[in-house]
Swiss-Prot record:
Enzyme class: transferase
PANTHER family registered for this protein in UniProt: S-ADENOSYL-L-METHIONINE-DEPENDENT METHYLTRANSFERASES SUPERFAMILY PROTEIN
Residues binding S-adenosyl-L-methionine: G77, F82, A128, E129, R147
Species annotation: Lysinibacillus sphaericus (strain C3-41)
EC number of the protein: 2.1.1.-
Name of the molecule in the record: Ribosomal RNA small subunit methyltransferase G
Length: 238
């Protein structure tokens, strides 16, 4: 997917990019490739791959969830900024917090944000488990999202505690998502969310399967979650 195809594909979905936004994506691609030479940010570095598998794939969440109706977004383990920064470029009003456990990625994100002139961005170097127990961040966000960070039973424990009651947990998954959802039923109920909507679709060009899950936060998360760093991954809620 080249830049023009990317612009056209978004237009078909009702997102018309301004010149400023087109330039922001171009700059994002350049910085990603440049910084990737000194640190491992992504295995995908060709233009067509980045525009499809990082930019378009990230924004695809907004085809099914209306980001224009929310303000605060937290992205857990965003790595090089996916999915939240492409979403932020398309929806500039958003206040975005990204938490990542690797400080060098936070350094990249700070630089990226400055270069793209993004406002209302907050980057936090922390383990998601500790971040979710911090009262400054816990149950503070309209939307908590993550893309391919961990299986859903683990991911939900890292993300759901950050969503406010009445907020949402939005998870972008590949084809294995359906199996993961079954395994995560207990975790999702325990943490206080219920499945609102589920969308299956294909990423254009390569036709790979994607599933987007939107969960409603219907009650507060019990204080014991998230548990200590590493525990959710070793022993998911069952």
């Amino acid at each position: 997917m080249n830049e023009q195809q990317f612009i056209e594909a978004l237009k078909k979905k009702g997102i018309e990019l301004s010149e400023k936004q087109i330039t922001q994506f171009k700059k994002y691609f350049e910085l990603l490739v440049e910084w990737n030479e000194k640190m491992n940010l992504t295995a995908i570095t060709d233009l067509e791959g980045v525009y499809l598998k990082h930019f378009f794939d990230s924004i695809s969440a907004s085809f099914y969830f209306d980001f224009s109706k929310v303000i605060t977004v937290c992205d857990v383990g965003a790595g090089a900024g996916f999915p939240s920064i492409p979403i932020k470029i398309c929806f500039p009003h958003l206040h975005v917090t990204i938490v990542d456990s690797l400080n060098k990625r936070i350094t990249f994100l700070n630089h990226l944000s400055d270069e793209l002139q993004l406002e209302n961005m907050n980057f936090v170097h922390a383990r998601a488990e500790e971040f979710g127990q911090n009262i400054k961040y816990r149950e503070q966000y309209d939307v908590v999202t993550a893309r391919a960070v961990a299986r859903l039973s683990v991911l939900s424990e890292l993300c759901v505690p950050l969503a406010k009651q009445g907020g949402y947990f939005v998870a972008l998954k590949a084809a294995a998502g359906a199996e993961e959802l079954k395994d995560a039923k207990k975790a999702l109920t325990t943490l206080g969310v219920k499945l609102k909507e589920e969308y299956s679709f294909k990423l254009p060009v390569e036709e790979s399967d994607r599933i987007l899950y939107i969960f409603d936060k219907i009650k507060g998360t019990p204080k014991k979650y998230p548990r200590k760093p590493g525990v959710p991954n070793k022993t998911p809620i069952q």
